[in-house]
Regions:
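A short, gly/pro- and small-residue-rich
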Residues: 107-126, 230-236, 291-303
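Catalytic binding pocket for nucleotide-activated donors in carbohydrate/polymer assembly enzymes
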Residues: 282-351
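Donor nucleotide-activated moiety binding/catalytic core segment of transferases
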Residues: 81-96, 248-285, 289-290
Length: 370
């Protein structure tokens, strides 16, 4: 057990259960402002991709927007505490709070019932176990529910509801298959045009080539994240030769392990991708929107099943499943030439049916009626 990780968890518990509730009670002296909506995140210094569509929608509706973004992983304890205090001050009187990941301050107190917290969870589908269903995410000794104040958790399809309820320790009625707001962008021609132009500028060497994107999830927890298979992808790129441009896009927790230079997010790379290689990442579900070939490269599959586990039968998903590097090149060539379009369609309908380009509209409707 990593002693630094354990100490960090106990500090979090102290701040969440003792300090922040006092700040909240002190600040909630005014009436709740139903025209005020707070967008907050502790993993990004700027607005996360997951929030863009809803942000544009609430601005169009004339709501007062407050943004509270800071990467707590980079900040000092005092800087993070200052940011938490700023959030609690606006949280105490805001009508709505929007988050897209675990956000400790929002769960630190018994919030006012008039304030609604919307969780735009960043991942589609429900593939690997997460949250309270695995100690890798939330240790058993951690006291408090980091998601308890969420009034609405948006998911990509009705199938996801019971699994999110279990992972988040929330009643099923709070898990709503309204769709994942950010996926609306995949249906907008202007967004696709912009990302293609940005891609051309960032990757001029890809001109005239097929694009292969490797986008794995991370292993372990956010504080001790690691990746699997990077050397194999490097060797694959050499085998594929000049016909392909191979791009690596790691989870945000792992970006620091790659050379700097790639400023495009995975969501911005998907529209220009001809073939995706992933493993247990929810990006697989995003990619179903484009109905293009994919390969699941999982060299640690047996170990992952034992230590983490899944909400579904992983082996039934579309795309070639490859456990050995020896089979990776052949699988990529085969899938690129001939892939099962019907399997992709059925998988989309089961796990992504609410991601139809109108998710933000449904979320806005809920927000107005809440």
């Amino acid at each position: 057990m990593n002693i630094k990780f354990v100490i960090r968890q106990f500090i979090k518990m102290g701040v969440q259960n003792l300090f922040l509730p006092v700040v909240y009670r002190f600040c909630k002296k005014r009436h709740v402002n139903k025209n005020c909506i707070v967008f907050a995140d502790a993993h990004h210094e700027d607005m996360p991709f997951s929030m863009r569509c809803l942000y544009q929608a609430v601005k169009k509706n004339g709501m007062h927007v407050v943004m509270q973004f800071s990467d707590y992983g980079k900040g000092s304890f005092l800087d993070n505490l200052k940011n938490m205090l700023q959030f609690m001050r606006v949280y105490a009187n805001a009508g709505y709070v929007v988050v897209c990941d675990n956000f400790l301050p929002a769960a630190s107190c018994k919030k006012r019932s008039e304030t609604k917290v919307i969780q735009l969870w960043h991942g589609c589908g429900a593939l690997k176990k997460f949250g309270y269903d695995t100690p890798e995410d939330i240790p058993s000794y951690y006291k408090g529910n980091v998601l308890r104040n969420c009034d609405c958790v948006t998911v990509s399809a009705p199938w996801c509801v019971p699994y999110f309820a279990s992972a988040m320790a929330l009643p099923q009625e709070r898990i709503m298959p309204l769709g994942i707001s950010r996926t609306d962008l995949y249906y907008r021609p202007e967004f696709l045009k912009i990302v293609r132009k940005r891609f051309q500028n960032e990757y001029p060497q890809a001109a005239g080539k097929k694009v292969l994107l490797w986008a794995p999830t991370f292993r372990g927890n956010a504080a001790q994240a690691r990746v699997c298979g990077q050397e194999a992808i490097d060797r694959l790129a050499q085998k594929l030769g000049e016909e392909w441009c191979v791009i690596k896009c790691l989870h945000p927790h792992m970006r620091k392990k790659l050379p700097k230079g790639n400023c495009l997010t995975a969501e911005e790379l998907l529209p220009v991708t001809d073939l995706l290689i992933t493993d247990y990442s929810s990006i697989l579900f995003d990619y179903l929107i484009f109905q293009k070939p994919l390969v699941r490269f999982v060299p640690d599959y047996q170990e992952y099943c034992k230590n983490r586990g899944f909400y579904m039968d992983y082996e039934t998903l579309p795309g070639a499943m490859v456990e050995s590097e020896d089979d990776l090149y052949a699988a990529v060539v085969k899938e690129a030439q001939d892939y099962d379009k019907e399997a992709l369609k059925k998988t989309f309908e089961k796990y992504m049916s609410a991601c139809d380009g109108h998710a933000t509209e449904r979320i806005m409707k809920w927000l107005k009626e809440a």
